[in-house]
Amino acid sequence: MPTIQQLVRKGRHDKTAKVATAALKGSPQRRGVCTRVYTTTPKKPNSALRKVARVRLTSGIEVSAYIPGEGHNLQEHSMVLVRGGRVKDLPGVRYKIIRGALDTQGVKDRKQARSRYGAKRG
């Protein structure tokens, strides 16, 4: 416990809250280039091959981003738009790629929740 004199000299400092999406540098989304597109397996109770891309953002940081939806057209050097949002069963994946923006196509034959997957109404 500091003395009153120590508080007069130094004061108290607020703790800064840690940001979950630091690589976006305060932006809602960030553009990036895929450096690697691959599949990975989820944590213990689940079993699948989750589609993930390694993306170099315009902020200069390289992050792992999840590719949501069934099927995708991404490959190395594809331009993608990345938003925040982690994938609970993939450790270290804290970003998602926005479907239907830049080089990423929307999900084909999607009928419900279309806006999340960049699917047109037709």
From Swiss-Prot:
**Known InterPro entries for this protein?**
NA-bd_OB-fold, Ribosomal_uS12, Ribosomal_uS12_bac
Report one GO cellular component: small ribosomal subunit
Q: Which SUPFAM superfamilies match?
A: Nucleic acid-binding proteins
> What Pfam families has UniProt attached to this entry?
Ribosom_S12_S23
Query: What are its GO biological-process terms?
Result: translation
* One Gene Ontology term of the molecular function aspect: tRNA binding
Q: Which UniProt keywords apply?
A: Ribonucleoprotein, Ribosomal protein, RNA-binding, rRNA-binding, tRNA-binding
Entry function: With S4 and S5 plays an important role in translational accuracy.
How it assembles, according to the record, is:
Part of the 30S ribosomal subunit. Contacts proteins S8 and S17. May interact with IF1 in the 30S initiation complex.
The similarity annotation says: Belongs to the universal ribosomal protein uS12 family.
What is this protein called in UniProt? Small ribosomal subunit protein uS12
Question: Per the UniProt entry, what species is this protein from, by scientific name?
Answer: Corynebacterium efficiens (strain DSM 44549 / YS-314 / AJ 12310 / JCM 11189 / NBRC 100395)
